[in-house]
Amino acid sequence: MCLKLHLINDENLKIKNDKDLLKYDVSNEKKIYQLSEEQNNAYKELSKYDSGFRVHLLQGTTGSGKTIVYFKAIEKILNIGSQALILLPEIGLTNEFEKKFKSYFGFEAAVWHSKVSPKKRKIIWNGLSSGRIKVAIGARSSLFLPFKKLGLITVDEEHDQSYKQDEGIIYNARDMAISRA
């Protein structure tokens, strides 16, 4: 589907109504979260190097606060004008994750997976390629979206076998994320 969307002419990609993108605008209305000492140490390690390519593995038990740590890293990326991609292993995790994201940031991230409508795909494609949409949450296929200035890719639950595509073009989304970064 991504390839088909990419081949649509520019006229079809233009958004007729700008309000379709408004819900993705970065907002200042967000909750303030205090990091625990352990989370703060992990965040400092993630933030040590401000430029260049690097890969980190943030490991912790369920409920240990890993999500808040990488939300903080995404926040830093957004503050310098870059975009972020959060990969989830399964579509079923999207709704709950969207709520966490909106609660933390105060705005919606674009959600990309096989069940997204063609109209919404067009809006997201245009918004990411123009830089208007700053964050996308998605399944494996979101790796192929046209980000204008991608600054961070987070692979949530990177050990999950769902990241491995065994049909059609065979690839591992975790490995592709490293290559794309």
Give the ranges of each region predicted by the language model:
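Accessory, non-ATPase domains that flank or precede helicase/AAA+ motor cores in DNA-metabolism machines
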Residues: 1-181
